[in-house]
Amino acid sequence: MKTNVAVFFGGRSVEHEVAVISAVQAMNFMDTEKYNIIPVYITKNGEMYHNENMKNIDEFRNIPALLEKSQNVTMVKQGDKFNIVELKKGLFKKVISSVDIAFPVVHGTNCEDGSVVGWFELLGIPYASCDVLSAAVGMDKAVCKYVLQKAGVPVLDCVQFYAKEYVAKKEGILKEIEDKFGYPVIVKPANLGSSVGISKADDKDELISSVKDAMNYASKIIVEPAVTELRELNCSVVGDTDDCETSVIEEPVMTGKILSYDDKYKGGEKSAKGSKGVKGGETAVGSKSSGMASLSRKIPADITDKIKKDVETYAEKTFKALGCNGVVRIDFLYDTAKDKVYVNEINTIPGSLSFYLWEPKGVKYKTLLDRIIELGFKRARTKENLKFSFDTNILENSMSFGQKGSKGSKI
């Protein structure tokens, strides 16, 4: 019997389109002899729709037309089953399909930050990705730094502040940044990915402009010193806290001061034929090099054995410190002047699920997807042995609690 895998993708995020690309790509590589694949598209306003044709990226060229011919759905628990049901008026809901495991392919705020998997946890359905805590910590760049520092993983120092705080204490915050780091600095929204809202500031005017831009995307901002002699390195990790392994290491190719959104997701347009030392990619979704995989990159990165070992060690430490599950990608800053690496951020649901970092190790995308799903089921089996309630019911005596009103009673 095949396993029913519901792939949830899209979402209320500035990285919505990237998630669509990643998800369609993944669905086209899943083993159809093992899985029934159920696409569930989450719109930018949070509605969910199902259509079997959502496995074809061309359908998303006209989303209103796609939704018009799709079913508005949600997922519910009915008895001991999890079902995708059509949302219609009336007592009885049409069951589209039962679901054995949920597979989220979402990126960014309101999605990758634990919001979607929190819903899965509430329902109690097995799911194939990081849990709520690791996803939430991984999304908040400031909190993630604090956790990793405690775990002995090198990260850059930062100044963090909130938008309202900045408006009230602007000059004081700017002075703190200048006194602590000088220039240049990097300004980032604290909880976005894909390089959205990130910019480099070489002086005070640019810092003010960068903060203003970042506040368009998040209310919490971080500023950190810029590494001037910089190379960026990425490494994927797959597994769980019991056992995990690292992929090959890549070096993305930057076209500007920092690795931009266009570098990550439009790089294939300029490198479709590839070039010496840089892996280019086709841009057609469903091909091996679309989405994050279209980024111009060097695989493997041309680095020393020492740096390679450092990246692999800190990637595993980061994975375990956050309690990750499934596949993640950890991005590093390599300060060539100091010959030192720092963890920049973790992507708990990475673009293209980082399959392109596993293929050089002989792991096919189909095999990687199998493992991610197996890890989701493994975690669910482990949870079945844990207690989540007691066999007592204090509400049996609730009448006595309610006599004096809930505010005056003590339980």
Where would I find each of the regions flagged by the language model?
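A short glycine-rich, hydrophobically flanked beta-strand micro-motif that places a catalytic Asp/Glu
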Residues: 38, 221-225, 233-234, 323-337
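ATP-binding N-terminal substructure of ATP-dependent carboxylate-amine bond-forming enzymes
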Residues: 1-133, 137-139, 143, 162-172, ...
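Short acidic-glycine loop/turn motifs at beta-strand connectors
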Residues: 43-46, 88, 239-242, 335-338
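ATP-dependent carboxylate activation and anion-phosphoryl transfer catalytic cores
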Residues: 3, 8-12, 290-298, 302-411
